[in-house]
Design a protein with these regions (language model features):
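Flexible, glycine-rich phosphate/dinucleotide-binding loops
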Residues: 51, 99, 127, 154
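A short glycine-rich beta-strand->turn/loop micro-motif centered on a GG-aromatic cluster
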Residues: 119-126, 143-157, 177
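Histidine-anchored nucleotide/phosphate-binding helix
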Residues: 30-34, 128-140
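Short, well-ordered secondary-structure micro-motifs
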Residues: 54-56, 103-106, 131-132, 158-159
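Alpha-helical scaffold elements lining the catalytic groove of polysaccharide deacetylases
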Residues: 94-95, 99-112
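Active-site catalytic pocket residues across diverse enzymes, especially alpha/beta-hydrolases
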Residues: 84, 107, 111, 139-140
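Active-site-proximal beta-strand/loop segments in catalytic clefts of secreted hydrolases
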Residues: 45-48, 96, 123, 150
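Active-site acidic carboxylates
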Residues: 1-92, 113, 146, 155, ...
């Protein structure tokens, strides 16, 4: 079975406090990708932080309040939310940090005894996409894990490219590198 992981396509990462033009540019590609999967094959992560985010370890390293639980910035982009209609409620994962061990557990349950194929898209390539791709590879060492670069963006184009290089070293397949819509 093949699964799609949609990573953190939230307002704060697209148009909010950590938004970038690159994140906005990938939106049509991500919507297109979502539509190629059955809802049962899709898992969705959402970065989720408390009101005191700036006092946390992550907040001290990245002092920009974002994805505060219950805020507009925490919500999925409305077009993404619409495209994800029909995805089972238990496939949505609020995660308090970059990678989600809960995602790996849910994928194990969904895959059963199969060796799943896993594709990741979303934001930010160098933090949450990278972390979850490596978690998936560690959980399923015999699985093909891939990232569609045309459906990802990072803080800068350079950090995106660095993350893709790091994932390649971990035997994560990178598709559509160089075809990112924000490179045009």
């Amino acid at each position: 079975m093949k699964f799609l992981i949609v990573v953190d396509m939230q307002n704060d990462f697209i148009t909010g406090s950590l938004g970038t033009k690159e994140a906005e540019a990938i939106l049509p590609k991500v919507l297109e990708k979502i539509r190629t999967y059955c809802p049962e094959q899709i898992f969705v992560t959402q970065d989720t932080h408390p009101d005191n985010y700036l006092e946390t370890n992550e907040g001290r390293h990245l002092p920009v309040a974002h994805c505060i639980a219950g805020s507009e910035g925490h919500a999925l982009n409305p077009l993404v939310a619409e495209a994800l209609e029909g995805v089972p409620a238990d496939h949505f994962i609020c995660k308090p940090t970059f990678g989600s061990p809960l995602l790996a557990e849910k994928l194990k349950t969904a895959a059963g005894s199969d060796t799943p194929e896993i594709e990741l898209v979303g934001l930010c390539t160098g933090i949450c996409v990278l972390s979850n791709a490596i978690l998936c590879k560690a959980t399923f060492p015999e699985s093909d894990v891939s990232v569609d670069a045309a459906c990802c963006a990072c803080v800068t184009p350079q950090s995106h490219d660095t993350a893709l290089s790091a994932m390649k070293l971990c035997q994560i397949d990178i598709c559509n590198e160089g075809s990112e819509p924000w490179r045009e």
